[in-house]
Amino acid sequence: MSQSKKPSESTEVMPISGLLETLGFSNPSLRCAVRKIIETAGYTNPRKTNIAVDKAKFVQIYIKTNFRLVCSEECDAASGKKRTKSSLRVRADKCEFCNGSDQNRLVAKMAKNLSDRGLSEILIIGGSTQSANTLNRLLKSCKINLKIIEGTKRTNLKMAKLLCRNADLVVIWGATQLDHTVSKVFNIAAEPGTKVPVARPGLKALANAVNIHLRSD
């Protein structure tokens, strides 16, 4: 009876430079630095230019497990839940925080601007449930406390003043689900220096308005 042959390991290879490009390391100097990281980890050595495809999968897992892959200082700060890891700069489309999204990058910039100024209590009036959920998800790792008031829920002036008193910024999000009576009472209640009017819907508009306000503050 003939013995069954042991399946041979895959001999397919790929360029190491191509692997690093796939992970988002387009900058040559950074690619060189990451190459040294995987050499130290024992996945390759300085003499080799290619790597087995099977081994490349383990390299990807190693890099993603041990490092934060972010495209900017802002996205690095916003991905605060993984602060125990060192960060590596990658292309925006491979960024763990923004995934190449202009909206998410603006939110990350907003989060860093708020943090740099020691502002953490943010009151938002209006907006959709979907926008609120997205904003909470993006900022869940930041030291920012969001309180979102439904734009269709009536609030008396006394309560509005109490809410505004405890807020570092009061964002009044126009062109969303925001009744005129609700926006009016919060416009009265908020201190001028804390009030941020947003004229358009969408998180990009909100983040941009907050960033402009903080820049001119």
Spans of features found by a protein language model:
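Ser/Thr/Gly-rich flexible loops in soluble cytosolic domains mediating phosphotransfer, phosphorylation
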Residues: 189-217
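Redox- and metal-dependent alpha/beta enzyme cores, enriched for Fe-S-associated oxidoreductases
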Residues: 110-144, 148, 152-163
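Cysteine-rich micro-motifs
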Residues: 89-101
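Short metal-coordination and nucleic-acid-contact micro-motifs, chiefly zinc-binding Cys/His arrays
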Residues: 64-67, 91-94, 118
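Short metal-binding segments enriched for Cys and/or His
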Residues: 100-112
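Long terminal accessory regions outside catalytic cores
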Residues: 1-65, 71, 75
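Short, non-ligating residues that shape and space the ligands of small metal-coordination modules
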Residues: 77-81, 104-105
